[in-house]
Amino acid sequence: MNREVRYFTKPDKSAQMIIRNKKCWELTQAQKDEYIQNLTSKLAALRAHADISQEDLANIIGTSRQTYYAIENRKRTMSWSTYLSLIFFYDTVENTSQMIRELGVYPMQLVERFNDVTAI
């Protein structure tokens, strides 16, 4: 299958470089798995600091309460998209924004790659 990228307007040079060099901002599956494992072990503490119920958090991130419960209790592994949803949520909560960085569950490597124009 040919996965050609098509545009309605011509992208600027930096956008073209990002598309061509997407490897510079992708994480390997092993890196993603490590971030997911680190976050999973901290979910109960983060949720307590955010003062939110499992049901409310599940609704925010787009899962059922049962699915979130299984993830928090390590009976189920979360997907990368669920991980990102949780990180984005906890980054917006004042009580947990700094905490996710200090716990090493915030993907600073990914943020640095997105922000580092020279990596592109």
Regions found by a protein language model. Name each.
Residues 73:
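Short, conserved catalytic or interaction motifs in soluble domains
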Residues 95-120:
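Short, charged recognition helix plus adjacent turn
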Residues 51-70:
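Short alpha-helical DNA-recognition segment
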Residues 1-19, 108-110:
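General nucleic-acid-binding
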Residues 21-49:
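A short, Lys/Arg-rich alpha-helix, primarily the initiator
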Residues 81-102:
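DNA major-groove recognition helix of helix-turn-helix/homeodomain DNA-binding modules
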Residues 1-3, 41-57, 85, 118-119:
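Short basic helix-loop element that most often maps to the first helix and adjoining turn
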